[in-house]
Amino acid sequence: MVGETETKEKPKPTPDYLMQLMNDKKLMSSLPNFCGIFTHLERLLDEEISRVRKDMYNDTLNGSNNEKRTNELPDGIGPIVQLQEKLYVPVKEYPDFNFVGRILGPRGLTAKQLEAETGCKIMVRGKGSMRDKKKEEQNRGKPNWEHLNEDLHVLITVEDAQNRAEIKLKRAVEEVKKLLVPAAEGEDSLKKMQLMELAILNGTYRDANLKSPALAFSLAATAQAPRIITGPAPVLPPAALRTPTPAGPTLMPLIRQIQTATVMPNGTPHPTATLMSQAPEAGLIYTPYEYPYTLAPATSILEYPIETSGVLGAVATKVRRHDMRVHPYQRIVTADRAATGN
């Protein structure tokens, strides 16, 4: 009917959909010419990423079958107050468990998600809250670093009206307490989700539906690669196609052309026509140059005359003898060798 708008169902919060949203956000940030232009598009993209992460977080911790709680708050009554509460981390009971990484998440995304959902500020404080242990020891005892002398804890603060602040603080405490309960190895769904988010941020996430890991890696690399928008390519004329008949060798037509082209197009006789007419028996091999510069095989040593003058220092040329040997080790004695005694 006229006037009715079609409402499409929102996509389900899946890791693949979250990866697509993150890739779109990276693409928009990589285009300097479009940064700050599509403000509404960027806002909608951030809201969709927040919604998908929130739904995935709720499904991970609370289960997909549980009813979602309403985040509606009453109207504020009274002045703005600040409330805070400390939740100590059970590091003594579980010394090998990484509570700090579980609470903060990859690049602080889990803590940011809790802050956006509860409206409270969540910070990890106390001994062991800093990643750099040397820097922690240096800051211990300095002003504004007094919390390093306390045990590891989570500090939750909220600023709002009294009635609203109490509701927000209660929700935040419930959510943080869920993170302080360690799960068995292999059954920690929150850890799996955090690793998946880290893979999406690093560009190494692979879809479980793809059977070929090489194809999944190529898709992830293509998604992470920056795409450059270019103008339309100029239309070039089509290249000339090859003739269907094979072309002949290039040497023989050239020789035939030289042989047959006795008259040039302007009517003057070809310069090689006289040479060819003088020596028709030469055939295809002819030389327009003088004889000393022609290509000839190397002269055999047997063609040189034998020097018999007996000049001192002259090299005696050996004469090739064509006598056949009956036995390979038999020595042939000829008349000249018999005369000289050799």
UniProtKB/Swiss-Prot annotation:
* Main location, first listed in the record: nucleus
Q: Which SMART domains match?
A: KH
- The record lists its disulfide bonds as none
- Report the record's Gene Ontology biological process terms: cell differentiation; mRNA transport; negative regulation of macrophage differentiation; regulation of astrocyte differentiation; regulation of mRNA splicing, via spliceosome; regulation of translation; spliceosome-depend formation of circular RNA
Task: Give the record's keywords alphabetically.
Answer: Cytoplasm, Developmental protein, Differentiation, mRNA processing, mRNA splicing, mRNA transport, Nucleus, RNA-binding, Translation regulation, Transport
Q: Which domain of life is it from?
A: Eukaryota
Coiled coil regions, renumbered to chain: none
Choose one Gene Ontology CC annotation of this protein and give it: cytoplasm
Compartments where located: Nucleus; Cytoplasm
KH domain location is 88-154
Recorded GO molecular functions are: mRNA binding
Find motif (Nuclear localization signal) and give its ranges: 325-331
The keyword Nucleus belongs to this UniProt entry's keyword annotation: yes
Protein family: Belongs to the quaking family.
What the protein does?
RNA reader protein, which recognizes and binds specific RNAs, thereby regulating RNA metabolic processes, such as pre-mRNA splicing, circular RNA (circRNA) formation, mRNA export, mRNA stability and/or translation. Involved in various cellular processes, such as mRNA storage into stress granules, apoptosis, interferon response, glial cell fate and development. Binds to the 5'-NACUAAY-N(1,20)-UAAY-3' RNA core sequence. Acts as a mRNA modification reader that specifically recognizes and binds mRNA transcripts modified by internal N(7)-methylguanine (m7G).
Q: How does it assemble?
A: Homodimer; does not require RNA to homodimerize.
The protein's name? KH domain-containing RNA-binding protein qki.L
